Amino acid sequence: EPAIDEMAYRCGQDPLAFRLANMPDKDPGTGQPFASHDLADCLREGAEKFGWQNREAKPGSQNRGRQLIGYGVASTIRINILQPSKTRIRLSAAGTLTAWADMTDIGTGTYTILTQIAAETMGLPAGRVHIELGDSRFPQSSGSGGSFGAASSGSALQDACERMRTKLLEIATEQGLISEEPTENARFGDGRMIVGDTSLSFTELLHKTGEAYLEADGEVEPGDDHDNYSQHSYGAQFAEVHVDRDTGEVRVQRLLGVFSAGR
């Protein structure tokens, strides 16, 4: 990004306009088409919200007393990496869920992320979700690095939880606990399954089976789009920085980020 700024300066162009004018229409490294490309939109929206039009082009020309004022912009592009991953989950009759994957947490927040995914998908309080990682006896999953661990193992975990939800719906139907066919309208929350006017706890459902627990496996595999398209998330950052011309003290007055990370 500093090199882009230097090039824009030598070309006599605004660094934001220079970036927009040189936006690629395909991946310059692979030649693949982009699955999506929202960097320009991030830059434009950020510039409007930040007030980029108030920037003085000449370095050192904007000041407030001893404070030299500078505006900066930078682009963010993060590649989407999806690796084959598997997980296994167990829902106990006590209403707690345990998940296993052989990936590790190297400070990337894997325990927290996977707990959140399982809790949200199953409708359980986070305190009733237990994640076990880092054992080769567990299902093979992605490594940890950047964000691909969450995208890969997290997707496999979500798949396992969705399969568990299907099992619970099937049990309720087979036991005659719900009168209508299971649909996507079923809701899960607070350790319960709600279908229409019927609310059943996970504990009730497992007791009906006579089993101490239920298990489900989940997995994710990269599809054709992973090979045919260049996939990224995008962002743009804007900063206003003040530098004391006498002491060299630097103060970051404002930071703004605009991101297109998908849903």
Predicted regions and their residues:
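Cofactor-binding beta-sheet edge motifs in enzyme active sites
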Residues: E1-D41, E45-E48, N54-R263
